[in-house]
Amino acid sequence: MNASSRTKPAIDLNKVPPIDHHRTAVTFNCLIMKMTEMLNNFGNKMEDILEKAEQSLDTADRKLRLMESKLAGMSLEDKSTTATPSSAPEIDEIHESNPSSSQIVEETVEEKPEEHTTTVLIKDDPAYSKYFKMLKLGVLEAGVIQKMKSEGVDPSILKRGDEPSRPQAQTSRNYESSGESTASFSDSD
């Protein structure tokens, strides 16, 4: 057996009737439609998975920022608590000599933790970060401003993105004072 006998068919092609072109076209169309449908289904499933992953990352990021701000507040409280016992004998000595001056010293000790609190920028504030993210994703600024107005948010915040977010600092203090924690948040959304 030589190589040419392997490539030649054993059937005489002149005796075989031609294949119907219409039937061939229909077969290829069905094949292409099924492949397209399978690829679309796969793409839709992967898009859903990516959206869920992005949402879980966003919630994890928000929780992380809340925990960091809470921990930053706790570490400052620990420092002030550590500083208070070391200065307690001094306050007692001052209290014996002059009661009004001890009140002044205590007030200055309380003011120091407020000076060292970490501030979150407006663009990093979880309440406003979605608007800055929309701008990064290519949404027109006019559309973002309209959404902010519809949600009752001041649109001038977009211009002040690098300024510290004062409402965030106040809300984090409110959480600490009320005893609420981030453990009350759940992923059951």
Curated annotation (Swiss-Prot):
Pfam families: CCDC53 (PF10152). Disruption phenotype: RNAi-mediated knockdown positively modulates lifespan; effect abolished in hsf-1 mutant background. Increases resistance to both heat and oxidative stresses. Increases localization to the nucleus and also DNA binding activity of heat-shock transcription factor hsf-1 both before and after heat shock. Increases in transcript levels of heat-shock protein genes sim-1, hsp-70, hsp-16.2 and F44E5.5 after heat shock, but not in unstressed conditions. May also increase levels of post-translationally modified hsf-1 under heat stressed and unstressed conditions. Phosphorylated. Phosphorylation on Thr-182 may promote DHIC complex dissociation and consequently the activation of heat-shock transcription factor hsf-1. Phosphorylation is modulated by the Insulin/IGF-1-like signaling (IIS) mediated pathway. Changing T182A: Abolishes threonine phosphorylation. Expressed in pharynx, intestine, body wall muscles, vulva muscles, spermatheca, and several head and tail neurons. Residues 150-165 have a biased composition (Basic and acidic residues). Residues 76-101, 150-189 are annotated as: Disordered. InterPro entries: WASHC3. GO terms for biological process: actin filament polymerization; determination of adult lifespan; exocytosis; regulation of gene expression. Keywords: Coiled coil, Phosphoprotein. Probable component of the WASH complex. Component of the DHIC (ddl-1-containing hsf-1 inhibitory complex), which contains at least ddl-1, ddl-2, hsb-1 and hsf-1. Within the complex, interacts with ddl-2. Within the complex, interacts with hsb-1. Within the complex, interacts with hsf-1. Formation of the DHIC may be dependent upon the Insulin/IGF-1-like signaling (IIS) mediated pathway. PANTHER family: PROTEIN AD-016-RELATED (PTHR13015), WASH COMPLEX SUBUNIT 3 (PTHR13015:SF0). Belongs to the CCDC53 family. This is WASH complex subunit homolog 3. It comes from Caenorhabditis elegans. The lineage of its organism: Eukaryota, Metazoa, Ecdysozoa, Nematoda, Chromadorea.
